[in-house]
Protein backbone atom coordinates (compact mmCIF):
# COMPACT_ATOMS: atom_id res chain seq x y z
CA UNK A 1 0.00 0.00 0.00
CA UNK A 2 1.65 3.23 -1.19
CA UNK A 3 -0.52 5.78 0.65
CA UNK A 4 0.27 6.60 4.25
CA UNK A 5 -1.86 8.54 6.71
CA UNK A 6 -0.81 12.11 7.38
CA UNK A 7 0.02 11.45 11.03
CA UNK A 8 2.49 8.76 9.91
CA UNK A 9 4.03 10.81 7.10
CA UNK A 10 4.48 13.88 9.28
CA UNK A 11 5.47 12.13 12.49
CA UNK A 12 8.05 14.30 14.33
CA UNK A 13 11.65 13.34 13.53
CA UNK A 14 13.31 16.09 15.57
CA UNK A 15 12.58 17.67 18.93
CA UNK A 16 11.66 20.93 17.23
CA UNK A 17 8.83 19.10 15.42
CA UNK A 18 7.20 18.07 18.72
CA UNK A 19 4.42 20.64 19.14
CA UNK A 20 3.43 22.19 22.44
CA UNK A 21 5.90 20.32 24.70
CA UNK A 22 8.78 22.79 24.89
CA UNK A 23 9.21 22.23 28.65
CA UNK A 24 10.05 18.57 27.95
CA UNK A 25 12.08 18.85 24.75
CA UNK A 26 14.31 21.57 26.22
CA UNK A 27 15.10 19.44 29.29
CA UNK A 28 15.92 16.38 27.19
CA UNK A 29 18.10 18.38 24.81
CA UNK A 30 20.16 19.83 27.68
CA UNK A 31 20.58 16.36 29.17
CA UNK A 32 21.79 15.02 25.81
CA UNK A 33 24.34 17.79 25.32
CA UNK A 34 25.70 17.37 28.85
CA UNK A 35 25.51 13.55 28.72
CA UNK A 36 23.47 13.55 31.91
CA UNK A 37 20.50 11.57 30.69
CA UNK A 38 18.87 9.03 32.99
CA UNK A 39 18.59 5.25 32.61
CA UNK A 40 14.77 5.34 32.89
CA UNK A 41 12.10 7.83 31.83
CA UNK A 42 8.33 7.92 32.26
CA UNK A 43 6.38 9.89 29.66
CA UNK A 44 2.76 10.46 30.69
CA UNK A 45 -0.01 12.50 29.13
CA UNK A 46 -3.12 12.41 26.91
CA UNK A 47 -3.17 10.51 23.64
CA UNK A 48 -1.62 12.07 20.57
CA UNK A 49 0.61 14.55 22.41
CA UNK A 50 3.98 13.16 21.26
CA UNK A 51 5.08 10.67 23.95
CA UNK A 52 6.17 7.83 21.66
CA UNK A 53 7.56 10.24 19.06
CA UNK A 54 9.69 11.98 21.70
CA UNK A 55 10.94 8.59 22.89
CA UNK A 56 12.09 7.58 19.39
CA UNK A 57 13.71 10.98 18.81
CA UNK A 58 15.56 10.59 22.12
CA UNK A 59 16.69 7.09 21.08
CA UNK A 60 18.06 8.51 17.82
CA UNK A 61 19.81 11.40 19.58
CA UNK A 62 21.68 9.21 22.09
CA UNK A 63 22.76 6.82 19.33
CA UNK A 64 23.53 9.43 16.67
CA UNK A 65 27.03 9.11 15.20
CA UNK A 66 27.56 12.83 15.88
CA UNK A 67 26.63 12.59 19.58
CA UNK A 68 26.49 14.46 21.86
CA UNK A 69 23.86 16.45 19.98
CA UNK A 70 20.59 18.08 20.98
CA UNK A 71 18.90 16.97 17.74
CA UNK A 72 19.39 13.75 15.74
CA UNK A 73 20.92 14.36 12.34
CA UNK A 74 18.56 11.87 10.61
CA UNK A 75 21.34 11.32 8.06
CA UNK A 76 23.65 8.77 9.67
CA UNK A 77 23.06 5.02 9.53
CA UNK A 78 21.98 4.88 13.18
CA UNK A 79 19.32 7.60 12.80
CA UNK A 80 17.98 6.14 9.56
CA UNK A 81 17.94 2.62 10.98
CA UNK A 82 16.00 3.68 14.08
CA UNK A 83 13.55 5.67 11.95
CA UNK A 84 12.72 2.75 9.65
CA UNK A 85 12.88 0.17 12.46
CA UNK A 86 15.75 -1.90 11.07
CA UNK A 87 18.01 -1.59 14.14
CA UNK A 88 17.17 -4.27 16.67
CA UNK A 89 18.76 -2.43 19.59
CA UNK A 90 15.83 0.01 19.81
CA UNK A 91 12.89 -2.14 20.87
CA UNK A 92 9.34 -0.77 20.92
CA UNK A 93 6.97 -2.93 22.99
CA UNK A 94 3.21 -2.66 23.27
CA UNK A 95 2.42 -3.45 26.91
CA UNK A 96 -1.26 -3.92 26.11
CA UNK A 97 -0.51 -7.13 24.20
CA UNK A 98 2.70 -8.09 26.05
CA UNK A 99 1.60 -7.61 29.63
CA UNK A 100 2.58 -10.93 31.16
CA UNK A 101 5.44 -11.91 33.44
CA UNK A 102 7.09 -14.07 30.76
CA UNK A 103 7.49 -11.15 28.34
CA UNK A 104 9.12 -8.97 31.02
CA UNK A 105 11.40 -11.83 32.10
CA UNK A 106 12.49 -12.15 28.49
CA UNK A 107 13.42 -8.45 28.53
CA UNK A 108 15.26 -8.93 31.82
CA UNK A 109 17.30 -11.79 30.37
CA UNK A 110 18.20 -9.99 27.13
CA UNK A 111 18.94 -6.57 28.62
CA UNK A 112 22.33 -7.75 29.85
CA UNK A 113 23.60 -8.28 26.28
CA UNK A 114 25.42 -5.35 24.72
CA UNK A 115 23.88 -3.57 21.72
CA UNK A 116 25.00 -4.83 18.35
CA UNK A 117 24.65 -1.81 16.06
CA UNK A 118 24.47 1.35 18.21
CA UNK A 119 25.81 2.67 21.51
CA UNK A 120 22.71 2.30 23.68
CA UNK A 121 19.98 -0.31 23.75
CA UNK A 122 16.66 1.52 24.21
CA UNK A 123 13.43 -0.15 25.35
CA UNK A 124 10.28 1.88 24.61
CA UNK A 125 7.32 0.32 26.47
CA UNK A 126 4.07 1.92 25.33
CA UNK A 127 0.89 1.85 27.47
CA UNK A 128 2.99 0.55 30.36
CA UNK A 129 0.05 0.81 32.78
CA UNK A 130 -1.40 -2.32 31.10
CA UNK A 131 1.30 -4.54 32.62
CA UNK A 132 0.21 -6.97 35.30
CA UNK A 133 1.39 -6.68 38.90
CA UNK A 134 3.67 -9.65 38.41
CA UNK A 135 5.18 -8.05 35.32
CA UNK A 136 5.84 -4.82 37.20
CA UNK A 137 7.54 -6.75 39.99
CA UNK A 138 9.69 -8.58 37.44
CA UNK A 139 10.73 -5.22 35.97
CA UNK A 140 11.62 -3.58 39.29
CA UNK A 141 15.20 -4.76 39.74
CA UNK A 142 16.15 -4.27 36.10
CA UNK A 143 14.62 -0.80 36.07
CA UNK A 144 16.49 0.21 39.22
CA UNK A 145 19.95 -0.97 38.14
CA UNK A 146 20.03 -1.58 34.39
CA UNK A 147 23.32 -2.09 32.52
CA UNK A 148 25.14 1.06 31.45
CA UNK A 149 24.28 0.45 27.82
CA UNK A 150 20.50 0.25 28.43
CA UNK A 151 17.80 2.96 28.64
CA UNK A 152 14.12 2.39 29.45
CA UNK A 153 11.41 4.81 28.27
CA UNK A 154 7.92 4.06 29.59
CA UNK A 155 4.90 5.78 28.03
CA UNK A 156 1.38 5.86 29.47
CA UNK A 157 -1.88 7.76 29.37
CA UNK A 158 -2.84 6.66 32.91
CA UNK A 159 0.13 7.15 35.27
CA UNK A 160 -2.05 6.63 38.36
CA UNK A 161 -2.25 2.91 37.50
CA UNK A 162 1.53 2.49 37.68
CA UNK A 163 2.99 1.34 41.04
CA UNK A 164 4.85 4.03 42.94
CA UNK A 165 7.90 1.77 43.12
CA UNK A 166 8.15 2.01 39.32
CA UNK A 167 7.52 5.77 39.17
CA UNK A 168 10.18 6.48 41.81
CA UNK A 169 12.81 4.78 39.64
CA UNK A 170 12.12 6.99 36.60
CA UNK A 171 12.41 10.61 35.60
CA UNK A 172 8.82 11.63 34.95
CA UNK A 173 7.73 14.03 32.21
CA UNK A 174 4.08 15.05 31.93
CA UNK A 175 2.99 15.87 28.39
CA UNK A 176 0.16 18.41 28.25
CA UNK A 177 -2.70 18.86 25.83
CA UNK A 178 -1.70 20.84 22.77
CA UNK A 179 -3.45 24.17 22.34
CA UNK A 180 -5.72 24.76 19.36
CA UNK A 181 -3.43 27.53 18.12
CA UNK A 182 -0.41 25.18 18.11
CA UNK A 183 -2.39 22.46 16.31
CA UNK A 184 -3.56 24.92 13.66
CA UNK A 185 0.01 26.14 13.16
CA UNK A 186 1.26 22.59 12.63
CA UNK A 187 -1.59 21.76 10.22
CA UNK A 188 -0.87 24.90 8.20
CA UNK A 189 2.68 23.66 7.63
CA UNK A 190 1.35 20.27 6.57
CA UNK A 191 -1.22 21.62 4.09
CA UNK A 192 1.47 23.88 2.64
CA UNK A 193 3.80 20.92 2.24
CA UNK A 194 1.04 18.87 0.62
CA UNK A 195 -0.04 21.85 -1.51
CA UNK A 196 -3.63 21.61 -0.30
CA UNK A 197 -6.23 24.39 -0.38
CA UNK A 198 -8.24 24.99 2.78
CA UNK A 199 -10.96 27.52 3.53
CA UNK A 200 -10.35 29.93 6.40
CA UNK A 201 -11.78 28.60 9.65
CA UNK A 202 -11.83 24.93 8.67
CA UNK A 203 -8.56 24.07 10.41
CA UNK A 204 -9.77 25.76 13.60
CA UNK A 205 -12.84 23.50 13.62
CA UNK A 206 -10.66 20.41 13.25
CA UNK A 207 -8.26 21.59 15.98
CA UNK A 208 -11.15 22.21 18.34
CA UNK A 209 -12.54 18.71 17.74
CA UNK A 210 -9.11 17.11 18.31
CA UNK A 211 -9.28 17.96 22.03
CA UNK A 212 -5.56 18.66 22.37
CA UNK A 213 -4.28 15.64 20.43
CA UNK A 214 -2.16 16.20 17.33
CA UNK A 215 -2.66 12.66 16.03
CA UNK A 216 -6.44 13.05 16.28
CA UNK A 217 -6.22 16.38 14.46
CA UNK A 218 -4.18 14.91 11.59
CA UNK A 219 -6.54 11.93 11.31
CA UNK A 220 -9.52 14.29 11.04
CA UNK A 221 -7.63 16.43 8.54
CA UNK A 222 -6.87 13.35 6.45
CA UNK A 223 -10.53 12.35 6.52
CA UNK A 224 -11.73 15.86 5.67
CA UNK A 225 -9.34 16.12 2.72
CA UNK A 226 -10.58 12.82 1.33
CA UNK A 227 -14.18 14.00 1.68
CA UNK A 228 -13.82 17.53 0.34
CA UNK A 229 -11.80 16.97 -2.80
CA UNK A 230 -9.99 20.05 -4.12
CA UNK A 231 -10.75 22.57 -1.36
CA UNK A 232 -11.36 21.84 2.31
CA UNK A 233 -14.41 23.95 3.22
CA UNK A 234 -15.82 24.90 6.61
CA UNK A 235 -18.98 22.89 5.90
CA UNK A 236 -16.88 19.80 5.21
CA UNK A 237 -14.95 20.22 8.46
CA UNK A 238 -18.21 20.62 10.41
CA UNK A 239 -19.68 17.52 8.81
CA UNK A 240 -16.61 15.36 9.40
CA UNK A 241 -16.09 16.42 13.03
CA UNK A 242 -19.79 16.45 13.94
CA UNK A 243 -19.39 20.00 15.23
CA UNK A 244 -22.02 22.72 14.96
CA UNK A 245 -21.54 26.02 13.18
CA UNK A 246 -21.14 29.02 15.49
CA UNK A 247 -23.97 30.63 13.53
CA UNK A 248 -26.41 27.94 14.71
CA UNK A 249 -25.12 28.02 18.28
CA UNK A 250 -25.46 31.81 18.37
CA UNK A 251 -28.99 31.53 17.00
CA UNK A 252 -29.93 29.01 19.70
CA UNK A 253 -28.28 31.14 22.40
CA UNK A 254 -30.23 34.22 21.31
CA UNK A 255 -33.51 32.27 21.43
CA UNK A 256 -32.71 31.15 24.97
CA UNK A 257 -31.90 34.71 26.01
CA UNK A 258 -35.13 36.02 24.45
CA UNK A 259 -37.10 33.27 26.27
CA UNK A 260 -38.47 32.18 22.90
CA UNK A 261 -39.12 28.48 23.50
CA UNK A 262 -40.61 27.91 20.05
CA UNK A 263 -37.59 29.25 18.13
CA UNK A 264 -35.14 27.48 20.44
CA UNK A 265 -36.82 24.08 20.02
CA UNK A 266 -37.11 24.63 16.26
CA UNK A 267 -33.38 25.37 15.96
CA UNK A 268 -32.56 22.37 18.15
CA UNK A 269 -34.76 20.09 16.04
CA UNK A 270 -33.09 21.35 12.85
CA UNK A 271 -29.64 20.52 14.22
CA UNK A 272 -30.69 17.07 15.43
CA UNK A 273 -32.27 16.34 12.04
CA UNK A 274 -28.85 17.00 10.52
CA UNK A 275 -27.54 14.09 12.60
CA UNK A 276 -25.80 16.12 15.31
CA UNK A 277 -25.14 14.27 18.54
CA UNK A 278 -27.17 15.80 21.42
CA UNK A 279 -24.33 15.24 23.90
CA UNK A 280 -21.80 16.92 21.59
CA UNK A 281 -24.24 19.73 20.85
CA UNK A 282 -24.91 20.48 24.51
CA UNK A 283 -21.16 20.41 25.14
CA UNK A 284 -20.68 22.99 22.38
CA UNK A 285 -23.36 25.16 24.01
CA UNK A 286 -21.61 24.95 27.39
CA UNK A 287 -18.29 26.02 25.84
CA UNK A 288 -20.05 28.82 23.93
CA UNK A 289 -21.54 30.30 27.10
CA UNK A 290 -18.27 29.70 28.94
CA UNK A 291 -16.34 31.65 26.33
CA UNK A 292 -18.98 34.37 26.41
CA UNK A 293 -18.67 34.66 30.19
CA UNK A 294 -14.87 34.96 29.98
CA UNK A 295 -15.07 37.47 27.14
CA UNK A 296 -17.67 39.48 29.06
CA UNK A 297 -15.63 39.62 32.28
CA UNK A 298 -12.18 39.93 30.64
CA UNK A 299 -12.45 41.15 27.02
CA UNK A 300 -8.67 41.30 26.63
CA UNK A 301 -8.21 37.55 27.14
CA UNK A 302 -9.41 36.34 23.75
CA UNK A 303 -6.56 33.83 23.70
CA UNK A 304 -8.20 31.68 26.40
CA UNK A 305 -11.42 31.21 24.42
CA UNK A 306 -11.76 27.54 23.47
CA UNK A 307 -14.45 27.19 20.80
CA UNK A 308 -15.60 30.66 19.82
CA UNK A 309 -14.39 33.02 17.16
CA UNK A 310 -15.16 36.55 18.33
CA UNK A 311 -17.29 38.20 15.66
CA UNK A 312 -19.83 41.03 15.68
CA UNK A 313 -22.76 38.72 16.50
CA UNK A 314 -20.91 37.23 19.46
CA UNK A 315 -19.98 40.68 20.78
CA UNK A 316 -23.57 41.94 20.57
CA UNK A 317 -24.95 38.86 22.28
CA UNK A 318 -22.36 39.05 25.07
CA UNK A 319 -23.45 42.63 25.77
CA UNK A 320 -27.12 41.64 25.94
CA UNK A 321 -26.88 38.55 28.17
CA UNK A 322 -26.07 39.36 31.83
CA UNK A 323 -23.49 37.32 33.71
CA UNK A 324 -26.11 35.88 36.09
CA UNK A 325 -28.05 34.45 33.14
CA UNK A 326 -24.84 32.84 31.83
CA UNK A 327 -24.23 31.21 35.23
CA UNK A 328 -27.73 29.75 35.24
CA UNK A 329 -27.58 28.47 31.65
CA UNK A 330 -24.18 26.83 32.13
CA UNK A 331 -25.39 25.17 35.33
CA UNK A 332 -28.59 23.80 33.74
CA UNK A 333 -26.81 22.57 30.59
CA UNK A 334 -24.04 20.93 32.61
CA UNK A 335 -26.55 19.01 34.75
CA UNK A 336 -28.41 17.86 31.65
CA UNK A 337 -25.11 16.80 30.06
CA UNK A 338 -24.35 14.62 33.08
CA UNK A 339 -27.83 13.06 33.01
CA UNK A 340 -27.48 12.23 29.30
CA UNK A 341 -24.85 9.61 30.13
CA UNK A 342 -27.44 7.40 31.81
CA UNK A 343 -30.32 7.59 29.35
CA UNK A 344 -31.28 6.16 25.97
CA UNK A 345 -33.11 9.36 25.03
CA UNK A 346 -30.60 12.23 25.29
CA UNK A 347 -32.73 14.44 23.05
CA UNK A 348 -35.45 14.65 25.71
CA UNK A 349 -32.98 15.92 28.31
CA UNK A 350 -31.75 18.60 25.89
CA UNK A 351 -35.30 19.75 25.13
CA UNK A 352 -36.15 19.83 28.85
CA UNK A 353 -33.01 21.91 29.47
CA UNK A 354 -34.07 24.39 26.76
CA UNK A 355 -37.54 24.82 28.26
CA UNK A 356 -36.12 25.06 31.78
CA UNK A 357 -33.67 27.79 30.78
CA UNK A 358 -36.47 29.84 29.25
CA UNK A 359 -38.65 29.40 32.34
CA UNK A 360 -35.76 30.18 34.67
CA UNK A 361 -35.14 33.36 32.73
CA UNK A 362 -38.81 34.27 33.17
CA UNK A 363 -38.56 33.62 36.89
CA UNK A 364 -35.40 35.68 37.18
CA UNK A 365 -37.15 38.53 35.42
CA UNK A 366 -40.16 38.10 37.70
CA UNK A 367 -37.92 38.54 40.72
CA UNK A 368 -37.27 42.15 39.73
CA UNK A 369 -40.87 43.38 40.28
CA UNK A 370 -40.75 41.86 43.76
CA UNK A 371 -37.71 43.97 44.55
CA UNK A 372 -39.45 46.98 43.03
CA UNK A 373 -42.47 46.30 45.23
CA UNK A 374 -40.28 46.24 48.34
CA UNK A 375 -38.63 49.47 47.31
CA UNK A 376 -42.06 51.06 46.81
CA UNK A 377 -43.05 49.97 50.31
CA UNK A 378 -39.90 51.56 51.70
CA UNK A 379 -40.69 54.77 49.83
CA UNK A 380 -44.23 54.72 51.25
CA UNK A 381 -42.81 54.28 54.74
CA UNK A 382 -40.44 57.17 54.22
CA UNK A 383 -43.31 59.34 53.00
CA UNK A 384 -45.35 58.35 56.04
CA UNK A 385 -42.43 59.25 58.28
CA UNK A 386 -42.18 62.66 56.62
CA UNK A 387 -45.90 63.16 57.14
CA UNK A 388 -45.57 62.27 60.83
CA UNK A 389 -42.73 64.72 61.16
CA UNK A 390 -44.94 67.52 59.89
CA UNK A 391 -48.07 66.58 61.86
CA UNK A 392 -46.92 64.82 65.01
CA UNK A 393 -43.42 65.91 65.75
CA UNK A 394 -44.43 69.56 66.30
CA UNK A 395 -46.66 68.60 69.18
CA UNK A 396 -44.03 66.26 70.51
CA UNK A 397 -41.48 69.06 70.44
CA UNK A 398 -43.23 70.64 73.45
CA UNK A 399 -42.81 67.48 75.50
CA UNK A 400 -39.35 68.37 76.88
CA UNK A 401 -40.95 71.29 78.76
CA UNK A 402 -43.23 68.87 80.59
CA UNK A 403 -42.26 66.64 83.44
CA UNK A 404 -42.76 63.40 81.47
CA UNK A 405 -43.12 62.51 77.81
CA UNK A 406 -46.69 62.40 76.61
CA UNK A 407 -48.39 60.99 73.56
CA UNK A 408 -48.52 63.69 70.86
CA UNK A 409 -51.79 65.60 70.77
CA UNK A 410 -51.52 66.47 67.13
CA UNK A 411 -53.97 63.68 66.31
CA UNK A 412 -55.51 60.50 67.59
CA UNK A 413 -53.14 57.61 68.12
CA UNK A 414 -53.58 54.73 65.70
CA UNK A 415 -51.79 52.27 67.94
CA UNK A 416 -52.01 51.68 71.67
CA UNK A 417 -49.22 49.73 73.28
CA UNK A 418 -50.18 46.69 75.45
CA UNK A 419 -49.42 48.34 78.79
CA UNK A 420 -50.30 45.32 80.90
CA UNK A 421 -48.05 43.01 78.91
CA UNK A 422 -45.20 45.53 79.07
CA UNK A 423 -45.59 45.81 82.85
CA UNK A 424 -45.31 42.03 83.14
CA UNK A 425 -42.08 42.08 81.14
CA UNK A 426 -40.70 44.94 83.25
CA UNK A 427 -41.35 42.96 86.44
CA UNK A 428 -39.19 40.10 85.15
CA UNK A 429 -36.68 42.28 83.26
CA UNK A 430 -33.00 41.97 84.10
CA UNK A 431 -29.94 43.83 82.98
CA UNK A 432 -28.07 40.68 81.75
CA UNK A 433 -31.01 39.71 79.49
CA UNK A 434 -31.08 43.21 78.00
CA UNK A 435 -27.29 43.24 77.47
CA UNK A 436 -27.48 39.83 75.77
CA UNK A 437 -30.18 41.07 73.42
CA UNK A 438 -28.40 44.33 72.59
CA UNK A 439 -25.14 42.49 71.89
CA UNK A 440 -26.97 40.20 69.47
CA UNK A 441 -28.79 43.02 67.65
CA UNK A 442 -26.04 43.63 65.10
CA UNK A 443 -25.96 39.93 64.19
CA UNK A 444 -29.74 40.04 63.77
CA UNK A 445 -29.52 42.90 61.27
CA UNK A 446 -26.74 41.12 59.37
CA UNK A 447 -28.86 37.97 59.20
CA UNK A 448 -31.74 39.97 57.72
CA UNK A 449 -29.43 41.30 55.00
CA UNK A 450 -28.38 37.74 54.16
CA UNK A 451 -32.07 36.80 53.88
CA UNK A 452 -32.63 39.73 51.49
CA UNK A 453 -35.38 41.02 53.79
CA UNK A 454 -35.05 44.66 52.80
CA UNK A 455 -38.37 45.76 54.29
CA UNK A 456 -37.69 43.97 57.61
CA UNK A 457 -34.31 45.65 57.98
CA UNK A 458 -35.86 49.04 57.20
CA UNK A 459 -38.34 48.65 60.07
CA UNK A 460 -35.54 48.00 62.56
CA UNK A 461 -33.35 50.95 61.56
CA UNK A 462 -34.84 53.22 64.25
CA UNK A 463 -35.67 50.58 66.86
CA UNK A 464 -33.96 49.73 70.16
CA UNK A 465 -34.45 47.00 72.80
CA UNK A 466 -35.28 48.77 76.10
CA UNK A 467 -36.24 45.90 78.42
CA UNK A 468 -35.82 42.14 78.32
CA UNK A 469 -36.80 39.19 80.46
CA UNK A 470 -36.28 35.47 80.04
CA UNK A 471 -39.23 34.94 77.66
CA UNK A 472 -40.07 38.35 76.15
CA UNK A 473 -38.60 41.76 75.41
CA UNK A 474 -39.79 45.29 74.69
CA UNK A 475 -38.67 46.92 71.44
CA UNK A 476 -38.97 50.71 71.24
CA UNK A 477 -39.77 52.22 67.82
CA UNK A 478 -39.14 55.82 66.88
CA UNK A 479 -42.19 55.89 64.61
CA UNK A 480 -45.59 54.61 65.60
CA UNK A 481 -46.37 53.18 62.15
CA UNK A 482 -43.33 50.91 62.35
CA UNK A 483 -44.48 49.65 65.74
CA UNK A 484 -47.96 49.00 64.38
CA UNK A 485 -46.63 47.03 61.38
CA UNK A 486 -44.55 44.80 63.66
CA UNK A 487 -47.43 44.27 66.08
CA UNK A 488 -49.72 43.24 63.20
CA UNK A 489 -46.97 40.95 61.82
CA UNK A 490 -47.12 42.58 58.38
CA UNK A 491 -45.27 40.46 55.82
CA UNK A 492 -44.30 38.07 58.65
CA UNK A 493 -41.79 40.52 60.11
CA UNK A 494 -42.41 39.76 63.82
CA UNK A 495 -42.47 36.00 63.26
CA UNK A 496 -39.22 36.16 61.29
CA UNK A 497 -37.46 38.26 63.95
CA UNK A 498 -38.55 35.93 66.75
CA UNK A 499 -37.33 32.89 64.79
CA UNK A 500 -33.93 34.46 64.12
CA UNK A 501 -33.50 35.41 67.78
CA UNK A 502 -34.49 31.89 68.84
CA UNK A 503 -31.80 30.40 66.59
CA UNK A 504 -29.21 32.89 67.92
CA UNK A 505 -30.03 32.86 71.65
CA UNK A 506 -31.29 29.29 71.98
CA UNK A 507 -34.59 30.37 73.54
CA UNK A 508 -37.83 31.86 72.32
CA UNK A 509 -38.51 35.51 73.19
CA UNK A 510 -41.78 37.24 72.33
CA UNK A 511 -41.46 40.69 70.76
CA UNK A 512 -43.62 43.48 72.22
CA UNK A 513 -43.41 46.81 70.42
CA UNK A 514 -43.90 50.23 71.94
CA UNK A 515 -43.71 53.68 70.29
CA UNK A 516 -41.08 56.02 71.65
CA UNK A 517 -43.75 58.59 72.48
CA UNK A 518 -45.59 56.11 74.75
CA UNK A 519 -42.60 54.39 76.29
CA UNK A 520 -41.71 57.18 78.71
CA UNK A 521 -45.21 57.32 80.20
CA UNK A 522 -45.49 53.52 80.50
CA UNK A 523 -42.13 53.28 82.23
CA UNK A 524 -43.00 56.13 84.62
CA UNK A 525 -46.32 54.53 85.54
CA UNK A 526 -44.62 51.20 86.21
CA UNK A 527 -42.01 52.81 88.46
CA UNK A 528 -44.68 54.69 90.43
CA UNK A 529 -46.79 51.57 90.89
CA UNK A 530 -43.75 49.59 91.94
CA UNK A 531 -42.79 52.31 94.43
CA UNK A 532 -46.26 52.23 96.02
CA UNK A 533 -46.05 48.46 96.38
CA UNK A 534 -42.72 48.76 98.13
CA UNK A 535 -44.03 51.51 100.47
CA UNK A 536 -46.98 49.32 101.47
CA UNK A 537 -44.65 46.50 102.47
CA UNK A 538 -43.73 45.96 106.14
CA UNK A 539 -40.13 45.17 105.33
CA UNK A 540 -37.77 48.15 105.72
CA UNK A 541 -36.20 49.24 102.47
CA UNK A 542 -32.53 49.89 102.46
CA UNK A 543 -32.72 51.75 99.16
CA UNK A 544 -35.26 53.89 97.39
CA UNK A 545 -37.41 51.41 95.40
CA UNK A 546 -37.62 53.85 92.50
CA UNK A 547 -33.84 53.97 92.30
CA UNK A 548 -33.56 50.20 92.66
CA UNK A 549 -36.01 49.60 89.84
CA UNK A 550 -34.23 52.13 87.64
CA UNK A 551 -30.93 50.34 88.28
CA UNK A 552 -32.59 47.06 87.41
CA UNK A 553 -33.84 48.41 84.09
CA UNK A 554 -30.90 50.45 82.79
CA UNK A 555 -27.98 49.45 85.05
CA UNK A 556 -26.31 51.16 87.97
CA UNK A 557 -23.54 52.59 85.80
CA UNK A 558 -26.01 54.80 83.94
CA UNK A 559 -27.79 56.12 87.10
CA UNK A 560 -26.77 59.42 88.70
CA UNK A 561 -28.45 60.15 92.08
CA UNK A 562 -28.92 63.77 93.10
CA UNK A 563 -30.40 64.95 96.41
Curated annotation (Swiss-Prot):
Q: Which InterPro entries does the record match to this protein?
A: AAA+_ATPase (IPR003593), ClpA/B (IPR001270), DNA_pol3_clamp-load_cplx_C (IPR008921), DNA_pol_III_gamma-3 (IPR022754), DNA_pol_III_sug/sutau_N (IPR012763), DNA_Rep/Repair_Clamp_Loader (IPR050238), HLD_clamp_pol_III_gamma_tau (IPR045085), P-loop_NTPase (IPR027417)
What is the reaction catalyzed? Answer: DNA(n) + a 2'-deoxyribonucleoside 5'-triphosphate = DNA(n+1) + diphosphate
What UniProt keywords apply to this chain's record, in alphabetical order? ATP-binding, Cytoplasm, DNA replication, DNA-directed DNA polymerase, Metal-binding, Nucleotide-binding, Nucleotidyltransferase, Transferase, Zinc
GO CC terms, sorted:
cytoplasm; DNA polymerase III complex; nucleoid
Q: What is its EC number?
A: 2.7.7.7
Where does the UniProt entry say this protein principally localizes? cytoplasm
Residues involved in Zn(2+) binding: 64, 73, 76, 79
A GO molecular function for this record? DNA-directed DNA polymerase activity
> Tell me, which GO biological process terms does this entry list?
DNA-templated DNA replication
Q: Which residues bind ATP?
A: 45-52
Please state the span of the N-terminal signal peptide per the UniProt entry.
Answer: none
Source species, domain of life: Bacteria
Q: Which family does it belong to?
A: Belongs to the DnaX/STICHEL family.
What NCBIfam families does this protein's entry cite? dnaX_nterm (TIGR02397), PRK05563.1 (NF004046)
Instruction: Tell me, in a sentence or two, what this protein's role is.
Output: Part of the beta sliding clamp loading complex, which hydrolyzes ATP to load the beta clamp onto primed DNA to form the DNA replication pre-initiation complex. DNA polymerase III is a complex, multichain enzyme responsible for most of the replicative DNA synthesis in bacteria.
Instruction: Give the multimer and partner information.
Output: Component of the DNA clamp loading complex consisting of tau(3):delta(1):delta'(1). The DNA polymerase III holoenzyme complex contains at least 10 different subunits organized into 3 functionally essential subassemblies: the Pol III core, the beta sliding clamp processivity factor and the clamp-loading complex. The Pol III core (subunits alpha, epsilon and theta) contains the polymerase and the 3'-5' exonuclease proofreading activities. The polymerase is tethered to the template via the dimeric beta sliding clamp processivity factor.
Protein name (Swiss-Prot/TrEMBL):
DNA polymerase III subunit tau
Species of the source: Bacillus subtilis (strain 168)
Amino acid sequence: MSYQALYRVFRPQRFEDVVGQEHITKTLQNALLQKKFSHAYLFSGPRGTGKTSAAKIFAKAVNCEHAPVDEPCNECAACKGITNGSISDVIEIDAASNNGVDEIRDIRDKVKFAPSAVTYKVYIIDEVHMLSIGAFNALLKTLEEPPEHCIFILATTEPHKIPLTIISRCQRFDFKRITSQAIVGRMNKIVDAEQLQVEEGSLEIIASAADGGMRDALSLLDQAISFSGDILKVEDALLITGAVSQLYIGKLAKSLHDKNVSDALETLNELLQQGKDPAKLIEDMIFYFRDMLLYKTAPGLEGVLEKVKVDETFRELSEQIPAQALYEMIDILNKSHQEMKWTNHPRIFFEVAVVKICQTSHQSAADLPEVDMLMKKIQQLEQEVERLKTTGIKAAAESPKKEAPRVPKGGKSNYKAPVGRIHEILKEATRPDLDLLRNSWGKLLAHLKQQNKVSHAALLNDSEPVAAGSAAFVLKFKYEIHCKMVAEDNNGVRTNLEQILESMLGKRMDLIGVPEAQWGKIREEFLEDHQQENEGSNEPAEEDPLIAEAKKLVGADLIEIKD
